[in-house]
Amino acid sequence: SQLLEDVYAYNDYSYSGRGPGCEPRSAVTPDLRKGYLISEFGGQQFPAKAFDDEPHRLAQALHHAAVLNDAIAQQGVAGALGWCMADYNTHREFGSGDRICYHGVTDLFRNPKLSAAVYASQKTPRSPSDVVFEVSSSMALGDHPGGFAGACWVFTNAESVRLYRGNDFIAEFTPDRRGRFAALPHPPIEIQDFVGSLLEKYEGLDQSTAPQVAAILNEMRRDALNLSPLSRARMLSLRLGANDLLRMYYKYIGVLGGPSSVYRFEAVWHGRTVRTVVKEPVQSVRLECVVHNPILTDGPTWDCAAVSLRAIDQNGNLLPYCGEAVQLSVEGPVKILGPAIVPLRGGMAGTYLATTGEAGRAVLHCRMEGALDVEAALTVRKRSGAENAN
């Protein structure tokens, strides 16, 4: 490649999940006096479908976070543009065999995947409504190999995250300003402790022993079959038997098929809780319908509104494995652009509503098996002749 204009733009697809997130500028551009922009990254290096399993969706989010972090940390890089905002239709030689490229941080209907929260959370909040708070894990053990829960990250611009198990406070977590994502304005927060002081409270362990046992249990949560030498040494020094350890593991971490726990995550901003996310087994399913532009103006051409559909649980959490079909119908001066029956993919779908030349009130009706029917109202205005002339 060569420098043709004032800014050297380079598509950097070098990151594969390990090592630096981007190449050194000095190894790429022939002229360090000129501006330098990473014009693309990510994309085919780590596509993720909205209906992929939890570890894969998380890995895509961390992939974007790593490249953004290292681009910010490197002096002389004007910016880095992730490829890309939304999944897109493509030709038969590309994509995932269905002529769709799943390179986006949103799906085809602009519904956000987990990786979209990486970008959204980099804005510094000015009010509680600006706080982004996305927990990567459903806390469902069955979504992971062997029933080991794996990693849990929170993508947020809050100051800290508090975790509760039932009514018990576990721990408060803050961004790691020296870790892998330290250069980001708001690094994602890894939740590493799911035991806290519960062993002191319920097992009677002293303040020296309890943290060591908790560390073993938290490591077992990620992979109980491959304990580190440090954890094995702790077991020996504490004379902790396998039966006692397993009993506490079942009680404080949980196993596949055992009693489930309710986890509450709280976003703390300016010393108070401004957002709450509750993770527990699904008890009910609700269809959510959001019209992004509920006031349309017809004339001199037609206007259009995008509609997002999501299947959510009783706590408002997305259900990424819900693939039910949603039946759509309308009343009033709008028409559906696209099919009247749309399947949820990754628990999400969408449609578009266009004006038909008339003014008035319009209603979109949505019906899905297993959930209550929902509807959304729109107002269609007619542009006046004088406005049309202008």
Label every model-predicted segment:
Residues C84, N89, F94-E288, N317-L319:
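Catalytic cores of secreted or luminal carbohydrate-active enzymes
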Residues Y252-G254, G350-E358:
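Extracellular/luminal low-complexity segments enriched in Ser/Thr/Pro
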Residues G258-V262, W302-C304, E358-R361:
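Extracellular Ig-like/FN3 beta-sandwich strand-entry sites
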Residues H103, D168-E172, Y321-P333, P339, ...:
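Short, well-ordered beta-strand segments
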Residues R180-I191, E331-M348:
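Low-complexity "stalk/linker" and mucin-like segments enriched in Ser/Thr/Pro/Ala/Gly
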Residues C152-T156, D303-P320, V363-C366:
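Beta-strand-rich structural segments
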Residues S1-S115, Q122, P128-P145, D176:
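Substrate-binding/catalytic cleft of secreted carbohydrate-active enzymes
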Residues L141-G147, I295-A305:
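Short, solvent-exposed loop/linker segments at the N-terminal edge
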